């Protein structure tokens, strides 16, 4: 069985490949798909050029591949077309397992990130590919900038209100992807994956305080206050508005659900918030 991991030189892709190797996969059976193949040389597996914007590179990378992990692209607004190119190539190549990293409740969520993931899930379903959907909650590592800022100022400011986030470490999500790629019995499943504990931003402030050794206060912001603050910090209006919309989604509960599925897949508890933050502090 040959496994292709797209976005293999990114933060998640690297960890997926490491998890595959840790679970006994033959390095020669793994292909790291990357826009810049030179950056994949340290992964210890085969590498192939794969550029989401170059369909010919995708088709070549998929030649002879049995299973694909499509790590969702990072270019918001461009992802559906990029994902379509991979889906089409996988269908043409006769891929027998297609795994996609989606977003929580992608088909029903009002989270600003959800529409592109919903569209991608619909494309996968329409393709008829034997698929597994991994709806990943937030990565704890997403809060690296918040940790650094709070360590400097003693304040965690956000528009997330009392919303809860069932985050886990990237390694947790990467292990789940490796399990699904290597094991039988997952085709047709849509897994909602999150950490064992859904925490709020008061909890986050406390966790940051624990790892930084200084008091940290959570300061809730209105949407207007947050938008003004982000623009004052140098963000353009579009980017600032996107961040505000993300936090509004958190406030509404878009990231709060957790049912233990991630822990069951990886065979251990998910990484606690404090431990995840300690790795990036």
Q: What residue spans do the PLM features occupy?
A:
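Conserved beta-strand segments of the P-loop GTPase G domain that flank and frequently precede/overlap
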Residues: 71
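Contiguous, function-dense segments enriched for cysteine-driven chemistry
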Residues: 31-35, 51, 89, 269-281
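A hydrophobic C-terminal alpha-helical subdomain
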Residues: 224-281
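Short-chain dehydrogenase/reductase
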Residues: 36, 40-44
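Rossmann-fold cofactor-recognition segment
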Residues: 44-54
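Oxidoreductase cofactor-interface core, primarily capturing Rossmann-like NAD(P)-dependent enzymes
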Residues: 2-37, 53-59, 63-65, 74-84, ...
């Amino acid at each position: 069985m040959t496994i292709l991991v797209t976005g293999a030189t990114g933060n998640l892709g690297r960890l997926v490949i490491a998890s595959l190797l840790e679970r006994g996969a033959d390095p020669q059976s793994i292909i790291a798909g990357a826009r810049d193949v030179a950056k994949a040389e340290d992964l210890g597996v085969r590498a192939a050029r794969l550029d989401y914007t170059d369909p010919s590179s995708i088709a070549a990378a998929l030649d002879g591949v049995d299973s694909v992990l499509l790590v969702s692209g990072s270019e918001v607004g461009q992802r559906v077309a990029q994902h379509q190119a991979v889906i089409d190539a996988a269908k043409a190549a006769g891929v027998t397992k297609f795994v996609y990293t989606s977003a929580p409740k992608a088909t029903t969520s009002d989270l600003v990130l959800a529409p592109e993931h919903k569209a991608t899930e619909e494309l996968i379903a329409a393709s008829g590919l034997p698929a597994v959907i991994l709806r990943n909650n937030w990565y704890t590592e997403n809060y690296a900038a918040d940790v650094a800022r709070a360590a400097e100022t003693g304040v965690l400011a956000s528009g997330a209100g009392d919303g809860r986030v069932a985050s886990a470490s990237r390694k947790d999500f990467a292990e789940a992807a490796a399990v699904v790629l290597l094991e039988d019995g997952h085709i047709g499943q849509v897994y909602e994956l999150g950490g064992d504990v859904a925490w709020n931003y008061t909890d986050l402030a406390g966790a940051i305080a624990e790892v930084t050794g200084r008091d940290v206060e959570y300061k809730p912001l209105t949407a207007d206050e947050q938008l003004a603050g982000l623009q004052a910090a140098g963000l353009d209006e579009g980017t600032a508005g996107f961040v505000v919309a993300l936090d509004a989604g958190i406030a509404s509960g878009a990231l709060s659900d957790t049912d233990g599925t991630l822990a069951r897949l990886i065979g251990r508890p998910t990484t606690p918030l404090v431990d995840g933050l300690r790795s990036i502090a």
